[in-house]
Amino acid sequence: HFTTAGEGGMVLTMDEDLGWECRAFRDHGYGVKARMNMLALEEALPYIHTRVGFNYRMTEVQSICGINELARFDSWNIPRRKAYAKMYDEAFAGLKGVKALPVNTAERENAYWWYPVTLNLNALKIDAPAFVNEMKKRKIPCYGIQWPEAYEERSYKELNGFGTAKFPFCSKEYNPKGINYEGVICPVAKSLRACTVNLFLHPTWEKEHIQRVIDAFVEIHNENLK
């Protein structure tokens, strides 16, 4: 979202199972063998990380592109995102069906990778997943919470860490008492899934694109007020 740096790298192995493990490891721990289309999988299933992994997908050429893009990060990328966020702020402020918008404080300033909107479900006839579906019917890119509570992922429930030792979950040196995520629940985080809608505001977009998102959002909001 912030640069155009992409994917690359190579590991050679004669072990097919190990090859699939490597693919999962390089891509955040996704279960890539089951589903190769990660975007479709993210939309269909909330929990898709089968093991702990990292983001090892960038080539040297793409790194050079990313470094050069960072040079104009504060002069082009972030200013455009902030300008589009302001358009959203002004359009959604005061809507009965909107509970909260992104907040900036003296200690923290948004970079606006996404623009999350917390819906007031007491004022609406639909929840966030239904709202997202209505946006998509209008051909507007929109998502709910794509990565819900981490403790619900298989990687944590099954303690799928690194290697046969499953580090750090089952490491006696690192964690002598062991870890069990089965009984973990964060009710506030869980509740946000039903009422959060994420909107795009990419710097390559123009104001008319943002206005289309606004028009669709407000239309759906007004049609579904209680």
Which residues fall in each region the model found?
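Glycine-rich phosphate-binding loop of ATP-grasp-fold ATP-dependent ligases
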Residues: 2, 6-11
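PLP-dependent aminotransferase class I/II
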Residues: 14-226
